[in-house]
């Protein structure tokens, strides 16, 4: 995982400060100074189930059909699509392995035949279409992650041969709460348009509504995540830390501008590709900011080590400052290569925080519940010990610690915002590196680099969650989601569907969601 080299570029900084677009100085970056490579850790799986994604209406792929009229071709394609998802022929939506039977590798078969049959995702082909060439030497599909509410696989998109991630959202329609949560996440994934936030590239064709139980979302495939990188033995340069932190805050500024709280920012939810581009993922716990302070918000959020003090103290109302606290913990973890506040229980978590920050004022605890305040006031009065942050590593410079101390503030109303954190001088080099050789918003020409006019864009309008107010039954939400997915089908792209014959797919559908121990722990009940 390497970062390209870059020299401080006065024109870019001028562009940033003045907010105008500028072409960079005219030297070409032919000789990048590569930073130490951070290869993604390999996943050890006992079996690599054979390869899994099929493209939809072949009419869309081959508009020119010599032997049939376009109308007939469209009809044939529609028939093929219907057959693929025809409830009459498939009693269950997908055949699942027999109970208790581990899905084994596919039986040996000629490679080409096996590859084509094994692809998990396929297009809706009809007899006149031909398989894309790249189906012959495809990587096997394999599980790459288990989120709070779903399983993620790495698969090949048969339309272009690109590797993508396929996320299965299972058991969507168990109850109304689950339906609403999944619909919210799905709408968010389709709403996001930002390079540091994971978004939906596609949603697989749903079957007939009577057989509609799971949702499959296609996203970009990322090779690693910040957790794997932090625990790996590879050195992390200060350039890596700056460019990672810059991208986390850039994505968070966008999310917060949309009025969204992520509520589970942790290293494992920050995906990183081989070019060090970072994307925030897993919106299973995200929600729109609650501006009415009298409305209670759930406390079952944020993995304990990254949980802000106001949540630990039972506050019934919190803001997007909880995400900034999590980022501060991650910043310290990037510097020190270990978890900053690694406690065994939520109460100990709070005690470790006050060991560093000192005993909070009553004003800083104003939103806490009485039991939590009593716990703090019963204990000894602690002085802050913030200078200890300089011992995290040699990279914990004055600027780094200054920014870190603006994030790790007990009182959420005094914690720095993502927007203000991005203006901190510590991040100037990260911004420069990102926009000089990593981003998609700036581009290079023969005369140099042309920078975007807005380095850290926000979204307008905000994400609208009013759709949730009128959802009253599982069947109603199911119909709305089914319709929503059909409407999302991207223009003239061939729709994708699951190939239920694929061995990998059989393994995929039997794979389970995170065990309860991996879920964010339940909130502390203060006496």
Curated annotation (Swiss-Prot):
Q: Name one GO cellular component term.
A: nucleus
| Catalysis: reaction(s) | L-seryl-[protein] + ATP = O-phospho-L-seryl-[protein] + ADP + H(+); L-threonyl-[protein] + ATP = O-phospho-L-threonyl-[protein] + ADP + H(+)
Q: What is its EC number?
A: 2.7.11.24
Q: Where is there biased composition of kind Basic residues? A: 26-54, 122-131
What is the source species?
Mus musculus
According to the record, the residues making up region (Disordered) are 22-72, 90-139
The name under which this protein is listed is Serine/threonine-protein kinase NLK
Domains: entry comment = Contains a TQE activation loop motif in which autophosphorylation of the threonine residue (Thr-298) is sufficient for kinase activation. This mode of activation contrasts with that of classical MAP kinases, which contain a TXY activation loop motif in which phosphorylation of both the threonine and tyrosine residues is required for kinase activation.
Post-translational modification, briefly? Phosphorylated on Thr-298. Intermolecular autophosphorylation on Thr-298 activates the enzyme.
Compartments annotated for it: namely: Nucleus; Cytoplasm
């Amino acid at each position: 995982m390497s970062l390209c080299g870059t020299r401080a570029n006065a024109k870019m900084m001028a562009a940033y400060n003045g907010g105008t677009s500028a072409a960079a100085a005219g030297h070409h970056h032919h000789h990048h100074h590569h930073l130490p490579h951070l290869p993604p850790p390999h996943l050890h799986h006992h079996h690599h189930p054979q390869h899994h994604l099929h493209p939809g209406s072949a009419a869309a792929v081959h508009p020119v059909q010599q032997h049939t009229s376009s109308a007939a071709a469209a009809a044939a394609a529609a028939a093929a699509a219907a057959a693929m998802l025809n409830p009459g022929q498939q009693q269950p939506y997908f055949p699942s392995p027999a109970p208790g039977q581990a899905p084994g590798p596919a039986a040996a078969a000629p490679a080409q035949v096996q590859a084509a049959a094994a692809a998990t995702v396929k297009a809706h082909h009809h007899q006149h279409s031909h398989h894309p060439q790249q189906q012959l030497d495809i990587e096997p599909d394999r599980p790459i992650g288990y989120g709070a509410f779903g399983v993620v696989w790495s698969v090949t998109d048969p339309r272009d041969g690109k590797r993508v991630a396929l996320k299965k959202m299972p058991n969507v329609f168990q109850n109304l709460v689950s339906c609403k949560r999944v619909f919210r996440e799905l709408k968010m994934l389709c709403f996001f348009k930002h390079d540091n936030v994971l978004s939906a590239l596609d949603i697989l064709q749903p079957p007939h509504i009577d057989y509609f139980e799971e949702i499959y979302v296609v996203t970009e495939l990322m090779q690693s995540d910040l957790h794997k990188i932090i625990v790996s033995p590879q050195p992390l340069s200060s350039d890596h830390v700056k460019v990672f932190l810059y991208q986390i805050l850039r994505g968070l500024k966008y999310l917060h501008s949309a009025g969204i709280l992520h509520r589970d920012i942790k290293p494992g939810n920050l995906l990183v590709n081989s070019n060090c581009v970072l994307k925030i993922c897993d919106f299973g716990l995200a929600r729109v900011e609650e501006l009415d302070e009298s409305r209670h918000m759930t406390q079952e959020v944020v993995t304990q080590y990254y949980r802000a003090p106001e949540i630990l103290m039972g506050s019934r109302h919190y803001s997007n400052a909880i995400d900034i606290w999590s980022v501060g913990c991650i910043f310290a973890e990037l510097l020190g290569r270990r978890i900053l506040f690694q406690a065994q229980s939520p109460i100990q978590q709070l005690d470790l925080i006050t060991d560093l920050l000192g005993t909070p004022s009553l004003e800083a605890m104003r939103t806490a519940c009485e039991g939590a305040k009593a716990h703090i006031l019963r204990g000894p009065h602690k002085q802050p010990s913030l200078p200890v942050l300089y011992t995290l590593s040699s990279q914990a410079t004055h600027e780094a610690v200054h920014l870190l101390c603006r994030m790790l503030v007990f009182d959420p109303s005094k914690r720095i915002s993502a927007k203000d954190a991005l203006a901190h001088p510590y991040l100037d080099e990260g911004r420069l590196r990102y926009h000089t050789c990593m981003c998609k918003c700036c581009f290079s020409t023969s005369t140099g680099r042309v920078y975007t006019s807005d380095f850290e864009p926000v979204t307008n309008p905000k994400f609208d969650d009013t759709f949730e107010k009128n959802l009253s039954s599982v069947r109603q939400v199911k119909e709305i989601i089914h319709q929503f997915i059909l409407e999302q089908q991207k223009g003239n792209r061939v729709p994708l569907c699951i190939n239920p014959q694929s061995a990998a797919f059989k393994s995929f559908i039997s794979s389970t969601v995170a065990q309860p121990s991996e879920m964010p722990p339940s909130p502390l009940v203060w006496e």
